[in-house]
Amino acid sequence: NTFKVSDKIKRGDFKLTKIDTDNQNRMSDIPFRVTCKGTGESHIIKTDENGYFSSESSWNAHSKNTNGGGAYDGLWFSSADGSAKVDDSVGAMPYGDYTLEELSCDNNRGKILYKGEFSIRRDKVTVDIGTIENHSEPTPVITTQASDAKTQYQIIKPSADTDIIDKVTITDTMAGRDYTITGTLMDKDTGEAVMVNGNPVTASQTFTSDGTKKVLDMHFNFDSSALGGKTVVVCEKLTYGDYVAATEEDMENKDQTIYFPEIHTTATDSETADHLTLADSRAVITDTVTYTNLLKGETYTLSGVLMDKETGKELLVDGEPVTQEMAFTAGRASGTKKLKFEFDTTGLAGKSFVVYETLTLEDVEVAEHKDINDEGQTIHIPAAQTTATDDSSKINVSEAKKEVSVTDTVAYRNLVPGKEYTVRGTAVDKETGEPLTDADGNELVSTAKFTAASADGSVDVKFTFDGTAMAGRSVVFFENVYYTDKLIAVHADIDDEAQTVHIPLIFTSVKDKDTDSHMSLAG
């Protein structure tokens, strides 16, 4: 007997049906990758509108748009040496082992993708893989807790080096899958991303899931200096590929919310109700502090210190800084508080000081207002110097005549420009220290009103009086400067030569060589 061994390769086919486990609906346009394990040859197939696929030529001819990857395209695997041509009379798959891997698409999004194997062993036999069901993936869950990385508070002082940490807990992810968590800071008022230097403030991390709970620290490092009074919400998004697996974007979620407080201050004198005070033994300055965006129910400490505007250092009175503080519990997110500073301003004429305020929560600074150039925080202590001259002699010597005219030039410093002031001068007998009076017994006074064009300047006050009775005596001109009828500067030095006009027994416009004064002895 003679036996003939055929070298014809066995070829077969396979078929499958795809359905959704949750609703038992057939799933169309689901792609699979079919790979021959022996040769590595690989092609894409796709289910039709009934969720069905068959490689049989009777269903879709192998020669029809061969390996096009569509639901109605033919499938053909060649031989190991690549010599097998497409033949609609035989099976699409040569003898061997194959893998079948479901590929992600919109129609199976959120489903657990199938991955399996099958074998072709018999010629002209179709392997029925059966019904492949898509079980839904577990839906990832995100929970977050945002706070300041340094203090762990959700209330943060605006600064150039803010570091917000969002502790993100992620559960129910698919083991082996690469995920990316991306966080964005959102302005709660506008619902838009917080922008710094034209860019949104974001943070992201990528991880490969092991199927267990994942906890990640998301750091947002940025300049929050401009966010005083703002509330921001940290929004997180979990993705794999271009698919959004989970989000935590609730703008009302307090755990995701960060508060940036803001304070503004206005300092005024208790007498003038303005930014002007008198150099006196007792000045009372009230600093009205307006705050916004505090956490209600928390207890805060408001601390103030007076700063010398000229030096930028703390203002010292009797060698000590001038400070004040108060504690309060915020009943509302926004409100006002008043700090009162009572201190001795004697010797501070001509100076300006600025009130600096700091707001703390349990010793952690959450807001400050420290602008040395902020006029609203500034108090000015005016100063005045006077120079009296006789209108006739042009020096501070007058003739003992019936009508003496004197001009007292008041040089002022440190006024607030644009405001109206009044200078009130009084002529005082240097010998008695009492004001001069006219024939009717009225004190000899003169006033001048002016609006200060600048902080420093001068104004003339005119005096006219009977000098006949003052021969051999001197008159000193005291000047007071008022703002809204409140005294803000005084120059009243009985021994100040510049304020003094002499009325000698014998009038001379030169100094006596023996007395070195404008007074000369008769005889």
Label the predicted regions.
Residues 1-523:
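Solvent-exposed loop/turn and edge beta-strand elements of beta-rich ligand-binding domains
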